[in-house]
Regions:
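Conserved class I S-adenosyl-L-methionine
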Residues: 3-12
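Class I SAM-dependent methyltransferase SAM/SAH-binding core
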Residues: 15, 19-56
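A short, aliphatic-rich alpha-helical micro-motif
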Residues: 42-43, 62, 84
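A short acidic, Gly/Pro-enriched loop at the edge of an enzyme's catalytic core
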Residues: 58-67
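A short beta-strand submotif of the Rossmann-like class I SAM-dependent methyltransferase core
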Residues: 67-73
Length: 191
């Protein structure tokens, strides 16, 4: 789209923003990044501001952005709904929020829990820095409570095989009446 304005929260050095600017040369891209050293690198090339979205004043005018990107950000926030409410005034009336969150209902997490295991990791669904966890239903409800409508949702799927014991546990779990759709356990992330 010609002349779109995009804000990415948690933009890192700005790779996604740079790609948008390359694909749509008329686009105006901006970013907010919490890590000072990373924000400084990106700020050499793009409009990237350093700050913590949970505590900072947003340095842009209201009704500015066509899109606000929150890629793997909400799960790191203390109060995701408060931040969505904080960002909404900066979105144009016909604008959209593009968001991705990991799925806590993933079969690897559930099979480990059924075996009494809960181990945080350096990356992934149980990343040590995650403060919030979401299922498909819960992330939709977060947006609805903020007065927004989820108009499109996609999923990325976990293709890693389960060990035999975990597979047996999950197959038994699928037999329980009223359990979530089997496919939801294979989702790694919602977008």
């Amino acid at each position: 789209e010609s002349g779109i304005r995009v804000l990415e929260v948690g933009c890192g050095c700005g790779a996604t923003l740079a790609h948008i600017a390359y694909e749509w040369p008329d686009a105006k891209v901006s970013g907010i990044e919490i890590q000072d050293d990373i924000a400084k690198i990106g700020a050499n090339y793009l409009d990237i501001r350093q700050g913590n979205i949970e505590t900072m004043q947003i340095p842009y005018e209201k009704d500015t952005f066509d899109y606000i990107i929150l890629a793997d950000v909400l799960e790191h926030l203390h109060d995701p709904e408060r931040i969505l409410h904080k960002l909404l005034p900066y979105l144009k009336a016909d604008g959209s929020i593009l968001c991705s969150v990991p799925n806590i209902l993933n079969r690897h997490v559930i099979s480990d829990l059924l075996r009494g295991k809960l181990e945080y990791q350096d990356a992934g669904i149980l990343d040590r820095t995650h403060l919030r966890f979401f299922t498909m239903d819960s992330i939709v409800r977060v947006f609805e409570r903020c007065g927004m409508e989820v108009t499109q949702m996609m999923a990325t799927y976990d293709t890693e095989e389960l060990d035999a014991e975990a597979e047996e546990l999950m197959n038994a779990l699928y037999q329980i009446p009223h359990i979530a759709d089997r496919q939801l356990f294979q989702v790694y992330q919602y977008v």
